[in-house]
UniProtKB/Swiss-Prot annotation:
The active site is at D535, E564. PANTHER family: GLYCOGEN DEBRANCHING ENZYME (PTHR43002). InterPro entries: Carb-bd-like_fold, CBM41_pullulanase, Glyco_hydro_13_cat_dom, Glyco_hydro_13_N, Glyco_hydro_b, Glycoside_hydrolase_SF, Ig-like_fold, Ig_E-set. This is Pullulanase. It comes from Thermotoga maritima (strain ATCC 43589 / DSM 3109 / JCM 10099 / NBRC 100826 / MSB8). Belongs to the glycosyl hydrolase 13 family. It catalyses: Hydrolysis of (1->6)-alpha-D-glucosidic linkages in pullulan, amylopectin and glycogen, and in the alpha- and beta-limit dextrins of amylopectin and glycogen.
Length: 843
């Protein structure tokens, strides 16, 4: 018996080891341009594995051919046709090939989503047709057509022809015979036509459905969308002007596959479908089912306020039931201006996720409600760490609902993610909740976290990721309700990839703009959020950002708004550093960052704090809050100091400690000591916390946080990303130094001047020298109790003597200590330690 079992095991292992899957892929491009195009293929079933690139090695009468051999028996693989190293995708969506008996042969047509298992017709077709307005349709064709031949063109609505007025080239620089055409109709498409089958027919071409794009802008709806709850009834509203019909499916349980009730929704105009369901639906789950563009789609609500685990279903909730005790009296810290904020960036799991945090609810929302937690050597951890440090605001990496990962799995070592793959923007992420299946629990726990932080005077800034979503098509509630409309696409129907994440949201579309404004105002009103950081803010159009600012500051003028003034590589910037002046929206100051730490792209390049050469002018620009200080060299992008976020590190790229360590290792002229690296760390903190503008600290920067040199730890385990409180104990002097600097800034308004005029009046640069920046804040700047304050940064690797202005000066910050207590009193000159900062004052 044992022999038979052994033989069976050998046979099974042999089958796995020696089996092979062969896939033949035929690819046809209508433009005949194959250079650079290749395949990315990955195993899906029965086992999922990483992908690999495969080249086309042959050709036939259809086009190019690739023969792909995989050393395992597969039944399904994923496939992407891509240009070079992800320069572009032929089709935006991931596609899949079904395999039988270890073999598959497929045909792929340029720009066509369907994968063919038999050789398809390659005759001309309409790639994509889109309605730009009620009279204008633009279409991209596989082959050129003569626009002078209007008689070739026909547009039908449910089979009924609409007269064509004229046909012209869509690109005015093109010639008349072109594959990009504009069709102008004699009659306008009506609102009811949007829900019908509109088809473009060109003689000699395969016809195409017309996708409604900018035409939908005319059907803006300014009312409340989603599930509008009351104990007596719930009103369901969804915006889908292109759907023939919409139903709401009601479920008693999140795992149910069959609804207990199906309710037909009624079209109310302006693209909105509505259904009223009587009774108390608190805790009921729901989905929408819609038919548009010839497909029946089932989706969660893009306006979901609550969901079941892993966003399987939306949920109706009585939000009043989710409020912790005393919620009506909860308030965040009130500040006069952004400049009063000291921002500290954290991730929910990072700050309490490791064993040595001493927190019970490790890595969860409730972990940040636990008080008086201790770590190694009795150092404070979690919430208590934030309170001891003294920061005014925490910037929390995404904690809205994101797609990646299983919310029921709390093993952050096995699975971890920053959360920059949005799915449902108005719902808290379930992975940080004690019970993701209960739609009320995650909401209540976020509120408890916010309340606990507010209790200690700490505001909550939410990291929002509007420029892209995790996926498109079936992986996007936007695309399910109104395909294509919410995204930027090109003339061929391909999703633009300005974000570098596979798609980019069209913030300029009125209903997308409404969604963004609705989302941030909802978080403020329901969760008492105190600010927002906008990921890839440069991809959001200026009008939308201004509407966000107006809406939020109407609620609370102290809400802090800032973001990344860039997008993906090479993307056009719509709201960059040059756009923030006068908007009450701040931008991350990458010039100041690089001056302090050196290039984020080349770890060996030293910044000012490591003795880097030629950084003095850029440091000065940062010191003055990036305003136009002198109209010459000391000027930058800001009209007001509130518009610059001054930072040296954040979750992206290397931590400050890791960056400086790598720069030290690359230094062929010098052996760096740990003490010198600590000095660089402290000098960076001193520059940030004594400069005008808004200081921003990467969580753990205050105790030399390391991620073991991982410069993109978005999915690294918690052992890499977590706050290691052993390091806080090890570098407690660096922590105390930052704590003292924060106390100094909070108690002295001279470091928090509120406008450019005050800065130019009260801030005077003093003689410096190579790698020295010195300035005076004079005449009780900002109403400061100290008459004059001198700040000196020494970026030299050796001690330096500096001549002080006349008088006796009280030192409150030197290379070892920082705070508001006098360390010593000096006159005439002061000896500056290497890589150090000094703050001195006189009455």
């Amino acid at each position: 018996m044992k022999t038979k079992l052994w033989l069976l095991l050998v046979l099974l292992l042999s089958a796995l080891i020696f089996s092979e899957t062969t896939i033949v892929v035929h690819y046809h491009r209508y433009d005949g341009k194959y250079d650079g195009w290749n395949l990315w293929i990955w195993p899906v079933e029965p086992v999922s594995q990483e992908g690999k690139a495969y080249q086309f090695t042959g050709e036939d009468d259809f086009g190019k051919v690739a023969v792909v051999k995989l050393p395992m028996d597969l039944t399904k693989v994923g496939i992407i046709v891509r240009l070079n190293e992800w320069q572009a995708k032929d089709v935006a969506k991931d596609r899949f090939i079904e395999i039988k008996d270890g073999k598959a042969e497929v045909w792929i047509l340029q720009g066509v989503e369907e994968i063919f298992y038999e050789k398809p017709d390659t005759s001309p077709r309409i790639f994509f047709a889109q309605a730009r307005s009620n009279k204008v349709i633009e279409a991209f064709l596989t082959n050129p057509v003569d626009t002078k031949k209007k008689e070739l063109f026909k547009v039908t609505v449910d089979g009924k022809e609409i007269p064509v007025s004229r046909v012209e080239k869509a690109d005015p620089t093109d010639i008349d015979v072109t594959n990009y055409v504009r069709i102008v109709l004699s009659e306008s498409l009506k609102e009811e036509d949007l829900r019908k089958d509109v088809e473009l027919i060109i003689e000699g071409y395969k016809p195409a459905r017309v996708i409604m794009m900018e035409i939908l802008d005319d059907y803006y709806y300014d009312g409340e969308l989603g599930a509008v709850y009351s104990p007596e009834k719930t009103i369901f509203r969804v915006w889908s002007p292109v759907s023939k019909w919409v139903k709401v499916l009601l479920f008693k349980n999140g795992e149910d596959t069959e609804p207990y009730q199906v309710v037909n929704m009624e079209y109310k105009g302006n693209g909105v479908w509505e259904a009223v369901v009587e009774g108390d639906l608190d805790g009921v789950f729901y989905l929408y089912q819609l038919e548009n563009y010839g497909k029946i789609r089932t989706t969660v609500d893009p306006y979901s306020k609550a969901v079941y685990a892993n966003s399987k279903k939306s949920a109706v909730v009585n939000l009043a039931r989710t409020n912790p005790e005393g919620w009506e009296n909860d308030r965040g810290p009130k500040i006069e201006g952004y400049e009063d904020a000291i921002i500290y960036e954290i991730h929910i799991a990072d700050i309490t996720g490791l064993e040595n945090s001493g927190v019970k609810n490790k890595g969860l929302y409730l972990g940040l409600t636990e008080e008086n937690t201790k770590g190694p050597g009795g150092v404070t951890t979690g919430l208590s760490h934030l309170v001891e440090l003294g920061v005014t605001h925490v910037h929390i990496l995404p904690f809205f609902d994101f797609y990646t990962g299983d919310e029921l799995d709390k093993d952050f070592e096995k699975y971890y993610n920053w959360g920059y793959d949005p799915y449902l923007f108005m719902v808290p992420e379930g992975r940080y909740s004690t019970d993701p299946k209960n739609p009320h629990t995650r909401i209540r726990e976020v509120k408890e976290m916010v309340k606990a932080l507010h209790k200690h005077g700490i505001g909550v800034i939410m990291d929002m990721v509007f420029p892209h979503t995790y996926g498109i098509g079936e992986l996007s509630a936007f695309d399910q309700t109104v395909p294509y409309y919410f995204y930027r696409i090109d003339k061929t129907g391909a999703y633009l990839n300005e974000s570098g994440c596979g798609n980019v949201i069209a913030s300029e579309r009125p209903m997308m703009r409404k969604f963004i404004v609705d989302t941030v105002t909802y978080w403020v009103k329901e969760y008492h959020i105190d600010g927002f950081r906008f990921d890839q803010m440069g991809l959001i159009d200026k009008k939308t950002m201004l509407e966000v600012e107006r809406a939020l500051h109407k609620i609370d003028p102290t809400i802090i708004l800032y973001g990344e003034p860039w997008g993906g590589w090479g993307a056009p910037i719509r709201f960059g550093k040059s756009d923030v002046a006068g908007t009450h929206v701040a931008a991350f100051n990458d010039e100041f960052r690089d001056a302090i730490r050196g290039s984020v792209f080349n770890p060996s390049v030293k910044g000012f704090v490591m003795g880097g050469y030629g950084k003095e002018t850029k440091i000065k620009r940062g010191v003055v809050g990036s305003i136009n200080y002198d109209g010459k060299l000391i000027k930058s992008f800001a009209l007001d100091p509130e518009e610059t976020i001054n930072y040296a590190a954040c979750h992206d790229n290397h931590t400050l400690w890791d960056k400086n360590y790598l720069a030290a290792k690359a230094d062929k002229k010098k052996e760096w000591t740990e003490e010198e690296l600590k000095n660089a760390q402290k000098l960076a903190g001193a520059i940030l916390l004594t400069s005008q503008g808004v200081p921003f600290l990467h969580g753990g920067q205050d105790f030399c946080r390391t991620k073991n040199f991982n410069d993109n730890s978005y999915n690294a385990p918690i052992s890499i990303n977590g706050f290691d409180y052993e390091r806080k104990l090890q570098f407690i002097d660096v922590f105390n130094y930052h704590k003292g600097l924060i106390k100094l800034r909070k108690e002295h308004p001279a470091f928090r001047l509120k406008n450019a005029e005050e800065i130019k009046k009260h801030l005077e640069f003093l003689p410096g020298g190579r790698r020295i920046v010195a300035f005076m804040l004079k005449d009780h700047a900002g109403g400061d109790p100290w008459k004059d304050i001198v700040v000196i940064y020494n970026g030299n690797l050796e001690k330096t003597t500096y001549k002080l202005p006349e008088g006796k000066w009280n030192v409150v910050v030197n290379s070892q200590k920082a705070g508001t207590e006098v360390i010593e009193t000096v006159e005439g000159t002061i000896e500056l330690d290497p890589l150090s900062a000094y703050v001195l004052y006189r009455e």
